[in-house]
Amino acid sequence: MPTGAEIILPWWLFVLMLALAVLALLDRLFVPSVRWFWRRRINRVVDEIGQRLQIEIRPFQLTKRQVLIDRLVYDPKIIEDARKLAREKNEPLELVQAQVAKYAREIVPAFNAYIYFRIGYWIAKQVAHLLYDVRIGLAHKAALQSVPEDATVVFTMNHRSNMDYVLVAFLAAERTTLSYAVGEWARIWPLQTLIRAMGAFFVRRNSGNPLYRSVLERYVHMATHEGVCQAVFLEGGLSRDGRLRKPKLGFLDYMLRSFDPQRDRDVVFIPVGINYDRVIEDRSLLRSLDQGAEKRSLWFVVRTTVRFILKSFWLMLISRWQRFGYACVNFGEPVSVKDYCREHAIDFRRLPRPERFEAVAGLARVLMEDIRREVPVLPVPMLAAVFDAHPQSWMTATQIERRAVKLLNRIAARGANVYQPGRDRRPYYVAKALDLMCMRHFIEEQDGRYRLNPSVADIMRYYANSVVLASEGKGIKPETAAEKEPLDAPT
């Protein structure tokens, strides 16, 4: 080719070469600088937050995700289970190990402290305060502060709403980070990425796959052994009728089956009670109990949700938005597993499977009773209990208040931790709750008197059940004849 001859390239090839050159430049010059910038910023956030957290971020949470996946895949117990399964199914071990790796990638989170505290915390706080008047009701501060710094703290909670994840993560963020087990419903983009970055991990509810359960068990064991603070819904799912469900023992068993009370760090359970003046999913939860109800399509669910969101935004724009009342969380007294094992002469490691499950069930009963006592008694559920007890009666606000106070006193007398508002604040709480209930057509109002709307008696009982469970098992005594008041029909 003669010197100085022109070389003609197609435009598409020139653009492609230019793009590759730019990418190479970015990869060699800019990407390392950006990576260094973000790493320094994240480390600064971790150091800053670590100074104010009561329970510090564990090294396990800051370990690279791929390292944790490899630890899980090559865990001796999982390798043993994989070999056993390969022999039983007459499959190559490599095929079974590939399945193990898939499960490990599915389960292991990708905790990012910057996203957790700078993005996740901000979103949780804004959403919680947008929807509710958020309160921490009762907290045993001295007992909570006495928890050893190296202990594995596990918040055990009742599951009232999907808002529980947001509410507890936001309220506990001043003390620690939380790792949740989240159902497969949340495995959609971009929610899946955000949830993993927040330290949560996905689980397949009611999975009967022994290999999957083995991988999940070892991950829970690793996280517990390394001191990761966790949040567990012992019921294993949302309450459908407002009452506490029977506890699921799987996660407790995973945490405790290898627990050495002499050498391992202590595992401390903190009972948490959650309640709302309005549960966003209340009608859907009740509908799920109706076996004859027509199944709603995905399109119906999406359409209804979008309409609800748009209506809420419109009410905000015209300054007519009202929050859904109170959302309250009570933190109970910690339960030390080491102390529990010592008091009951239990070593979970040495028990055969049936006896171990019975011992785990005994601890679960203790925790559920503690949770039951901590469930907050809020204005709307309290008034719902009053209306549910007197479905045909027309009552004035004063009569409703008196009946609510009597019920509150009976619940408190049976050991439930309830907040007793001052006498001068009671009319305010009653009036606010009545407004919320009228707005949702739970009650009928006529000439300053109120009565239960018969068409929503099931929803009223759903809210009333959260009050009854505060002393469930001991029963709430009915009013005596002397306590009852004459209730006149409106004129």
Identify the meaning behind each predicted range.
Residues 1-231, 236-491:
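Membrane-interfacial terminal anchoring regions of lipid-handling membrane enzymes
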